[in-house]
């Protein structure tokens, strides 16, 4: 596959010059965002609003800079993300919106609506065929994201405890999956009922098409018929009390490959453009209710029409940086018995790996790992 262009600029701004937000706008224009036909189109800007308590996510100002360019080109932008499969402040649309607003993503601040992609309970999804999929035949994608005419991803590039790093493919693939879609990527297992949390309301049973959930008259709790449960994850969104769990038992390589296939399902057949900011590179996901200190210095802003080339370029730039000594990565590198894997992300989270994601993404035609870095 031919190489793709990835555009890059750093965060330096001279006194009395353009702001760094203007610098981002100039970068995405130079990369060719204006070549996309956005006039009158619904444009989904896929990003992460940050978990409650976390402050390493991208500031709303970055989103506003992109929103203003989309509007200038005649588009109708909205910010979007889908609900999480685990307990927290983003597992349903009401709490998710409150969390986004608390973190500054209000319509007044960002200049457009914020729409939770998979609806109130995370069950409003569309099954999208994965062309060439080896792990997923039909991806479960939030309906609002699939209804959009154009996809723009805005990604905080950072470390991740499972996938090594969180980049464009994770933002789109995992982030656009409904609660059931996220479960499919994380696990091949069956539902488990946490009895102490179950209220016996039976709402979950209405969502199960396979008689996998049974009400136990003696305990007045729901139970799982493991012979019937197919692990679809639909029951996750039905429970308001976090009583249903799925163990994250999928191999990391399988998870990575599924993320790539979910990303392909989202992007196939639609115009898309992708932006990544290597800033506040925290060691773990922005899904945490806390964030540790950055593991490397800030690097810059990148964008491309190719999501895979963009992730590869971000990785390569990060690996050239000197680790910050007072960080999780620094701690690991000083630990007794440390084994150097010659990779910041693998040294940061030794149980993680990411090459399987990049390799599989290229195999299924998501993009190219070969790129030309255009600096400016």
Region locations from a protein language model:
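Extended, low-polarity segments enriched in aliphatic/aromatic residues
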Residues: 2-54, 58-62, 69, 73-81, ...
């Amino acid at each position: 596959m031919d190489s793709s262009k990835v555009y890059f600029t750093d965060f330096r701004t001279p006194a009395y010059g353009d702001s760094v937000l203007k610098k981002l706008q100039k970068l995405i224009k130079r990369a060719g965002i204006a070549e996309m036909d956005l006039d009158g189109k619904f444009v989904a800007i896929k990003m992460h609003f940050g978990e409650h308590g976390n402050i390493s996510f991208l500031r709303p100002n970055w989103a506003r800079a992109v929103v203003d360019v989309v509007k200038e080109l005649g588009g109708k932008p909205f910010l979007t993300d889908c609900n999480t499969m685990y307990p927290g402040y983003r597992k349903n649309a009401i709490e998710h919106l409150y969390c986004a607003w608390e973190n500054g993503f209000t319509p007044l601040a960002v200049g457009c609506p914020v729409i939770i992609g998979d609806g109130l309970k995370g069950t409003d999804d569309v099954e999208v065929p994965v062309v060439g999929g080896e792990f997923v035949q039909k991806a479960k994608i939030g309906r609002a994201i699939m209804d959009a005419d154009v996809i723009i991803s805005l990604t905080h590039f950072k470390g991740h405890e499972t996938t090594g790093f969180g980049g464009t493919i994770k933002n789109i693939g995992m982030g656009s999956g409904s609660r059931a879609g996220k479960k499919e990527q994380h696990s091949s297992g069956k539902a488990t009922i946490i009895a102490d949390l179950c209220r016996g309301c039976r709402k979950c049973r209405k969502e199960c098409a396979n008689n996998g959930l049974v009400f136990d008259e003696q305990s007045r709790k729901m139970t799982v018929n493991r012979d019937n449960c197919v692990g679809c994850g639909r029951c996750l969104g039905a429970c308001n009390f976090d009583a249903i769990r799925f163990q994250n038992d999928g191999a990391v390589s399988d998870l990575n490959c599924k993320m790539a296939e979910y990303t392909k399902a989202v992007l196939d057949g639609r115009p898309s453009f992708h932006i990544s900011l290597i800033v506040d590179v925290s060691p773990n996901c922005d899904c945490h209710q806390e964030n540790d200190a950055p593991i490397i210095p800030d690097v810059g802003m990148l964008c491309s029409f190719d999501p895979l080339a963009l992730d590869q370029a971000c990785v390569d730039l990060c690996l050239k940086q000197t680790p910050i000594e007072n960080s999780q990565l620094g701690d690991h590198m000083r630990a007794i018995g440390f084994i150097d894997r010659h990779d910041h992300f693998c040294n940061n989270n030794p149980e993680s790996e990411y090459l399987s994601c990049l390799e599989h993404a290229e195999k299924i035609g998501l993009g190219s790992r070969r790129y030309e870095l255009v600096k400016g």
